[in-house]
From Swiss-Prot:
GO terms for cellular component: chromatin; cytosol; nucleus; RNA polymerase III complex. GO terms for molecular function: DNA-directed RNA polymerase activity. Component of the RNA polymerase III (Pol III) complex consisting of 17 subunits. It is found in: Cytoplasm; Nucleus. One of its GO terms (biological process) is transcription by RNA polymerase III. Residues 1-22, 153-172 are annotated as: Disordered. Residues 155-172 have a biased composition (Low complexity). InterPro entries: RNA_pol_III_Rpc5. This is DNA-directed RNA polymerase III subunit rpc5. Keywords: Cytoplasm, DNA-directed RNA polymerase, Nucleus, Transcription. DNA-dependent RNA polymerase catalyzes the transcription of DNA into RNA using the four ribonucleoside triphosphates as substrates. Specific peripheric component of RNA polymerase III which synthesizes small RNAs, such as 5S rRNA and tRNAs. The RPC53/RPC4-RPC37/RPC5 subcomplex is required for terminator recognition and reinitiation.
Length: 242
């Protein structure tokens, strides 16, 4: 080993010592993988929602219904529409069912698997309990009510020409041949099968519980004493949202 290499190693060691002195380790915790919610914990994000206006009981907008399509990975959440500010009763009646105004809006998003190993952690009684996230989703307001209203209008109107009984005069029919050069090297990308699979899959309703039960969810983040020496088997039947 040359003198320059020895000098470089010595300088690196001095820098590490200085870093440890500036940012010392003040406490260590034993780490446990909690089995209670493993593979069942989802993180919901609301990119268009201000931090001070959460969908919660305090703001009168706690989620009412939650449903998912497990295979295609779609999620919908129904939340109340606040009527104290910026509420248009005419529009609400327009997009309602015809008898009463619309009272909820639907948030939708696609469930995604985390690209990194995201986890939720809880420090309690000098122990660090962690649970891996099964997935995350970004929920945004959807235009579901507008689409339903548009479809209702189309269904009521029926075929444009057959309903009136009149026909539009047409010019002479001419044959037009259109040819397109086929690129055999380009990859064939089609989303038709994805759309069809999404439409055919049935929604699975989930149990939506009030915020006051969140403490029980936090309790499940803790690894029970009897399972702390060894990991427990996972359960894949329930979802929990944070």
């Amino acid at each position: 080993m040359s003198f320059s290499e020895d000098q470089a190693m010595e300088e690196a060691k001095l820098r590490n010592d200085e870093t440890e002195e500036q940012d010392p380790v003040v406490r260590t915790y034993p780490v446990f993988f909690s089995p209670g919610l493993r593979n069942n914990l989802l993180l919901n994000q609301f990119p268009l929602r201000p931090k001070n206006r959460t969908y919660s009981d305090a703001n009168g907008e706690a989620p009412i219904d939650v449903r998912v399509k497990p295979k295609t990975g779609w999620m919908e959440v129904d939340v109340p529409i606040p009527t104290t500010k910026y509420y248009n009763e005419d529009k609400a009646m327009k997009y309602g069912n015809g008898k009463k105004p619309i009272q909820t809006q639907t948030l939708s998003g696609r469930l995604q698997k985390p690209r990194t190993n995201l986890m939720v952690g809880l420090i309690r009684d000098g122990q660090f309990h962690i649970v891996p996230l099964r997935g995350l989703t970004q929920l945004r307001p959807s235009m579901k009510h507008v689409n339903e209203y548009t479809q209702k209008l189309k269904a009521a109107a029926g075929p444009s020409n057959s309903s009136s009984g009149t026909s539009t005069p047409r010019g002479p029919i001419r044959a037009v041949q259109v040819t397109a050069k086929q690129n055999t090297e380009a990859p064939k990308v089609s989303t038709t099968h994805i759309v069809r699979a999404t439409e055919e899959e049935e929604w699975v309703e989930l149990d939506c519980r009030p915020e006051r039960e969140s403490e029980s969810i936090l309790k499940q983040l803790e690894c029970p004493i009897e399972h702390q020496p060894n990991e427990c088997a996972a359960v894949d039947e329930d979802y929990s949202f944070i």
